[in-house]
Swiss-Prot record:
One of its GO terms (cellular component) is cytosol. Pathway: Cofactor biosynthesis; thiamine diphosphate biosynthesis; 4-amino-2-methyl-5-diphosphomethylpyrimidine from 5-amino-1-(5-phospho-D-ribosyl)imidazole: step 2/3; Cofactor biosynthesis; thiamine diphosphate biosynthesis; 4-amino-2-methyl-5-diphosphomethylpyrimidine from 5-amino-1-(5-phospho-D-ribosyl)imidazole: step 3/3. Catalyzes the phosphorylation of hydroxymethylpyrimidine phosphate (HMP-P) to HMP-PP, and of HMP to HMP-P. The keyword ATP-binding applies. It is found in: Cytoplasm. Its EC number is 2.7.1.49, 2.7.4.7. In the N-terminal section; belongs to the ThiD family. In the C-terminal section; belongs to the thiaminase-2 family. The keyword Cytoplasm applies. GO terms for biological process: thiamine biosynthetic process; thiamine diphosphate biosynthetic process. It is an enzyme of class 2 (transferase). This is Putative hydroxymethylpyrimidine/phosphomethylpyrimidine kinase 2. 4-amino-5-hydroxymethyl-2-methylpyrimidine binds at E76. Keywords: ATP-binding, Cytoplasm, Kinase, Nucleotide-binding, Thiamine biosynthesis, Transferase. The lineage of its organism: Eukaryota, Fungi, Dikarya, Ascomycota, Taphrinomycotina.
Amino acid sequence: MPYNPLYESLSNQFDPSRIETVLDPMGYTIKRRALPVSLTIAGSDCSGGAGIQADLKTMTSLGVYGMSAITCLVAENAGGVDSVEEMSPAFVESQIDCCIRDIPCHVVKTGMLGSPEIVKAVARSAKKFNFSKLVVDPVMVATSGDSLVTKDIVSVLNEELLPLTYLVTPNIPEAIVLAKNQGLDISNINSVSDMERCAAVIHKLGPKHVLLKGGHMPVNNLGLKSSDDEDLRVVDILYDGNRFYHFSSSYLKKGEVHGTGCTLSSAIASFLAWEHSLTEAVQFGIDYVHGAITHSPPINNCSTNILNHMTRLRIVPFAPGHFIEYILSHPQVVPAWKEYINHKFTNMLAKGTLPLPAFQDYLKQDYLYLVNFARAYSLKGYKENTFPNILEAAQSVIHVIEEKELHVSMCSSYGVSLQDLKSCEESPACTAYSRYILDTGAAQDVAALDFVQAPCLIGYYVIAARLMKEPFRNPQGPYQKWVDNYFCEDYLSAVRRGCRQIEEIVLKLSPERIQELIEIFIRATKFETLFWETPYYEYVTKQNLEDKEFS
């Protein structure tokens, strides 16, 4: 990337850890300094549709830092399981220890636990690290029908892990297996009422909460098992020992879908990591899976569908705190930006060869422009709705007024009186530019106002910083005072403040809105160039006074 003095001056100004206000995946504003964290302890799925691959995709797409401890390596795809290579219990514990030792985590989910010894290892770790939100997905049968566990595993799961569990998430076949292992009969599940009875039985095994998933049994509007082509629903039941909560969603006639159980449990864990209540986490998790099924990508050869874990991802091509770098190097922005910050008007100004009438004309128009620049900040204050933001807009107005006083003083030193400034007629370029700013601010939001003013605010510092490094600059030249005014700590502080506002705003915007604002930035940049070009053409080009060094 070519040298830009702005990057150097703003380095370390936008440490993401300092941004305390963030949006969670549901759009809730949350105050926090760090990413939420969750750990998945499960088997792998080389095809990416289930297991830890699905877990980590889900956590990432929901804004959670995901860690994993692999229990088994599974050669499978949506069509079935080919083979399983089990990890040693000691190695599973070692993975968990490595994760938690470095990144503390209390929201943990489990998936496929390949042996009784691995279940015991996970239970030991749960006690050792006090997993307060342990979500257990009792993976027993693959979507394809392949068995993934033995009877011994079920016994140890019931006896050692479920009593430590915050939420267990069996589907109906898994719930039947869990209950049968303890000598409890919950077969013949044909209605929502039967599901409630089943959930209550599973609750007796020790977990604090049971989420019985109803995806294997669509029901009609009476809550009865049905396969008719009618308005079928899927009902998931959450039981806390006292109350049943029903979560109803439309039944998607997609056939078999690979990885829904893994994805739901990891989604619930993710929302718990965001500190949502359990009922919220369950509802949000169901909604996430519903969307992932709805947008199932038709890319696999197996008849079983796969999930689209990325339905909620919105890709932006910049990291938090680095948007200014991104926009100034954006291929659509660069041509207009380069023309603006490298204009021959500024080069001749720094060299001292710019005709005085050209500079005087610029000073007059800039005075009129500052009036409208202050009006724009006032408009921003009107559009804000919090005291800190209103105050910040007011401070920007004050800064422009202070800049105006310096401007009047500078004008006087170049033979332009205050009366000259007040009686000056606004040029078409100044009128077009300033009214574009005000019109954009009136018609759009605060973000648009920040972007339409940004080329002026940022550009003047960038130009001054560039000119200070140019070999052709005349430090004793007649216009060095102008360069000094915009290459000073006071002005840089204003630039930093404006850039920080933009950096914080863009984190809340969609990619589409960001692109719209970039286009506003480009147009405002072109108006800035026109602001140089008007006096340059009138007093340099038309008079054949161009400096050959810049031709």
